[in-house]
Amino acid sequence: MTKAEAFDKATKLAMKGDLALYDEILHPDYESMNQRVRINREMSKSILSENGPLFTVGPVQKIYENEEFVCIHRFSRIANKDVFYEVQTAITYENGKVIT
């Protein structure tokens, strides 16, 4: 499984409340930015598992991948609504784990 595939699978499982793979691929010092707000590992897990049912996530398209960086793109929608959006995600790795 590629890094992009693993991230996609882990995210989709986390959105259903299964955090095992997400825990496995995240670096202990993971941190991201979302709308200029810093999100740490535990916050990210909580956001995904609690808000997952609110979204329908489309298939992922890998834009770029190497050992240290992955860039993916996907379309999603708010569940049961005609509200669609697209997201481009940049993922960096440290020691084989997602760090940002």
Regions inferred by a protein language model and the residue ranges of each:
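C-terminal and inter-domain tail/linker signature
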Residues: 1-100
